[in-house]
Amino acid sequence: RAALQAEIEELRATLEQTERSRKIAEQELLDASERVQLLHTQNASLINAKKKLENDVSQLQSEVEEVIQRARNAEEKAKKAITDAAMMAEELKKEQDTSAHLERMKKNMEQTVKDLQHRLDEAEQLALKGGKKQIQKLEARVRELEGEVENEQKRNAEAVKGLRKHERRVKELTYQTEEDRKNVLRLQDLVDKLQAKVKSYKRQAEEAEEQSNVNLAKFRKLQHELEEAEERADIAESQVNKLRVKSREVHTKISAE
């Protein structure tokens, strides 16, 4: 009977130890489940953050492409304005050359008129001696030359007017070219800032993906630990059941004696 009592005590101690192991395994199982749930939540949050960053990067890339296109358009416009300004400058030079040529012709014609006037004065002196026919010819020539001088003055006035118009156009094109250059610089600065922002978002997306991978590894590790804890809990439960059966058998045997 003492041996049976000792065996019962031993079984009771084993049962208590097994029960404690079962409870520890169940607690480990609960802790592992909570950690798995937490990691699952964190991983889902990181995945959402990654998707948002990817969308932001895509949107920023579209904005960068749009700004780059605007910068290219502004640059093309600036180049065209510079070309137009160069052409206008060339036309202005031609007009200036024409104006200078007309001015020289005007001076030559004025000198010719002066010479003819002088000859006319001489002719008047001859008229006193009977040279009326010569005087009439000279007067007709003077009127003809005066008409030519007047026409040249009109053409010169038109040339000066056109010259001033070209000068105003050159100033406008110069101003527009400077504004286009400033716009190109501003757009380039905006492109640089947007590209820096895209790089930052890409880096954040990579970090989020890396963290997601780390959490996934932790999740898999915890899942493995959870499976092991469940297995240990099942083993402990089986041992407890076996010990309970054995304990009942021992009590039955004692009662029978």
Curated annotation (Swiss-Prot):
Its main location: cytoplasm. The keyword ATP-binding applies. Residues 1-257 form a coiled coil. The gene is Myh8. It comes from Rattus norvegicus (Rat). It comes from the Eukaryota. This is Myosin-8. Keywords: Actin-binding, ATP-binding, Coiled coil, Cytoplasm, Motor protein, Muscle protein, Myosin, Nucleotide-binding, Phosphoprotein, Thick filament. GO terms for molecular function: actin binding; ATP binding; ATP hydrolysis activity; microfilament motor activity. Disulfide bonds: none annotated. Muscle myosin is a hexameric protein that consists of 2 heavy chain subunits (MHC), 2 alkali light chain subunits (MLC) and 2 regulatory light chain subunits (MLC-2).
